[in-house]
Amino acid sequence: MLPEEIIKRPIITEKSMSMIPQKKYTFEVDRRANKIEIKKAVEQLFGVEVEKVWTMNVKPKRKRVGRFEGRTKAWKKAIVKLTDKSKTIEFFDSLI
């Protein structure tokens, strides 16, 4: 898979933004990607050094619209920690 296919989008929440000073960034990733592929994709796309990757599968939730009930899609979340000597990801710096 290409790095652009692995990293789908950044997760912008209050909790993920509070982890940025610790050099931890949160992304939605392809469900088939493993930690090694995620690490290589982040390093290639953003030009940084990754120290550690945590992944978690987010289960679908039940949602209702009127009388119709459905489910959201299941997706995979990755939290990436950069090394101390690595530069920060510029996209997230503009959000702080």
Curated annotation (Swiss-Prot):
InterPro entries according to UniProt: Nucleotide-bd_a/b_plait_sf (IPR012677), Ribosomal_uL23-like (IPR013025), Ribosomal_uL23/eL15/eS24_sf (IPR012678), Ribosomal_uL23_CS (IPR001014)
Any single biological process term in GO: translation
Keywords from the named record: Ribonucleoprotein, Ribosomal protein, RNA-binding, rRNA-binding
Gene3D superfamilies per record: 3.30.70.330
A GO MF label: rRNA binding
Keyword tRNA processing: no
One Pfam family from the record: Ribosomal_L23
One GO term describing the cellular component: ribosome
Domain of life: Bacteria
Function: One of the early assembly proteins it binds 23S rRNA. One of the proteins that surrounds the polypeptide exit tunnel on the outside of the ribosome. Forms the main docking site for trigger factor binding to the ribosome.
Subunit: Part of the 50S ribosomal subunit. Contacts protein L29, and trigger factor when it is bound to the ribosome.
Family label: Belongs to the universal ribosomal protein uL23 family.
PANTHER family according to UniProt: 60S RIBOSOMAL PROTEIN L23A (PTHR11620)
Protein name in UniProt: Large ribosomal subunit protein uL23
Organism: Caldicellulosiruptor saccharolyticus (strain ATCC 43494 / DSM 8903 / Tp8T 6331)
